[in-house]
């Protein structure tokens, strides 16, 4: 469905939400917000082949929002993650790195085996000792603006099945605006259940994130 069709379907199924209650202009603004929210929750917009980051000797961190257009997060599900020299490296926490070696911050440069995140930054567990190999990051992306009469979710045809999520989003927002007892909670529950199902169908619920269990109990 294109944007106008989504709004028409919403009004058809919610006749009490007239234009006096919710103007088309306000609904279109909500749809743009909903497009961003749904993509963020379901992580449905991902890059195709990952982004190659050219490395230099002694590099130990990178600004991912600078290196990757519309970067939202690292895609940590199977087929994603971060690789160095085409080998996957582990995501860790600073606490895990401290547990493994209290002197990791001062270790000599070499081949990174892991990384940790700080917001938009990715930090390697050691600085790189050569510019011979590249880092590759597979990312979840921020969707394109949904401000025209086109399909949502970057107009990706394989996501057309899930356009109904935006009808549930409009319904949730409208019921919250009206404030009828019981209806607001029901609309919120329906929206949440749909997104949970959508994420599962897209893969986030079928596969778990890749982690490696260590003998010391840390992952």
Language-model features: locations:
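Glycine-enriched, solvent-exposed interface loops adjoining structured elements
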Residues: 1-219
């Amino acid at each position: 469905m294109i944007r106008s069709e989504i709004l028409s379907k919403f009004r058809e199924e919610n006749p009490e939400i007239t234009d006096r209650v919710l103007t088309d202009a306000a609904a279109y603004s909500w749809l743009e917000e909903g497009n961003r929210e749904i993509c963020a929750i379901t992580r449905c917009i991902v890059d195709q082949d990952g982004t190659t980051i050219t490395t230099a000797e002694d590099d130990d961190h990178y600004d991912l929002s600078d290196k990757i257009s519309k970067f939202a997060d690292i895609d940590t599900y199977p087929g994603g993650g971060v690789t160095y020299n085409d080998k996957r490296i582990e995501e860790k926490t600073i606490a895990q790195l401290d547990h493994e070696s209290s002197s990791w911050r001062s270790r000599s440069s070499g081949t990174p085996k892991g990384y940790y995140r700080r917001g938009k930054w990715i930090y390697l567990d050691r600085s790189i000792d050569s510019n011979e190999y590249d880092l590759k990051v597979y990312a979840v992306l921020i969707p394109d603006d949904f401000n025209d009469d086109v399909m949502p979710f970057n107009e990706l045809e394989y996501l057309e099945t899930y356009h109904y999520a935006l009808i549930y989003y409009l319904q949730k927002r409208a019921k919250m605006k009206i404030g009828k007892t019981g209806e607001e909670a029901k609309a919120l529950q329906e929206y949440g259940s749909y997104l949970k199902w959508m994420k599962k169908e897209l893969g986030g619920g079928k596969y778990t994130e890749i982690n490696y269990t260590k003998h010391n109990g840390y992952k």
